[in-house]
Design a protein with these regions (language model features):
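Conserved N-terminal subdomain of the carbohydrate kinase-like
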Residues: 1-37, 58, 206
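Conserved phosphate-binding/catalytic region of the ribokinase-like
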Residues: 102, 106-206
Length: 206
């Protein structure tokens, strides 16, 4: 059915990422950085990620793409990440998990998103709902787009391509609604291709 599943092993190299002068120098130059929860399962990498985020410029987009995998996350990791982020990317299944974890399972989707946006003073919250569309919540505004109907070959890379093209569009000065549209269209195209990193047609980039 084209839907991915993962078996993630422990003790990987990315569990032990050191914080180096080179990494600190890179952080100070960033216009955007995307981070998730999985690489934070080990304290070494988690501390490096937090130090990297703390070293970024004030106007850097710090995107927490929550990306819950197996049991490699905790409430504390999610809260600490949200404190450092100014953008959150989450899908509808993850939102249910977070709703239970944070103690508001009975709220509807939109109210959960508005609550998280306000509580953690985020600039944006991006919610993807598979075939049921996607939302971008920002302070005082919401963008909703339906998911294009396509012949799905492989969903691996769909979320990352959405996030990457959305963030690149925002950095290039596109309004949020237009950046959202580009993200949706690129993600839909990636779903029609085998593999996570197909060549993106130029027509989809603008």
């Amino acid at each position: 059915d084209g839907v991915a599943s993962y078996d993630i092993k422990e003790g990987s190299a990315w569990d032990n990422i050191p914080f180096t002068p080179e990494i600190e120098a890179l952080a100070k130059q960033c216009r955007a950085v995307c981070f998730g929860s999985l690489a934070q399962r080990n304290k070494v990498s988690r501390d490096t990620i937090y130090r990297f985020l703390d070293a970024t410029p004030k106007d850097c987009m710090r995107i927490f793409d929550i990306n819950l995998r197996q049991n490699f996350y905790s409430k504390e990791i999610i809260q600490e990440s949200l404190k450092r982020a100014n953008v959150m990317k989450i899908n509808d299944e993850e939102l249910v998990t977070i709703g239970r974890m944070f103690g508001y399972p009975g709220m509807d989707v939109e109210n959960k998103c508005w609550l998280i946006l306000g509580k953690y003073n985020l600039d944006m919250l991006v919610l993807t709902c598979g075939v049921n569309g996607s939302y971008v919540f920002s302070k005082g505004a919401m963008s909703y787009l339906e998911t294009p109907k396509v012949e799905v070959a492989d969903t691996v890379g769909a979320g990352d391509s959405f996030t990457g093209s959305f963030v690149a569009s925002v950095l290039n000065g596109k309004p949020i609604a237009e950046a959202h549209r580009i993200g949706v269209n690129v993600s839909a195209y990636v779903c029609t291709q085998n593999g996570a990193m197909p060549v993106i047609p130029e027509a989809l980039k603008s």
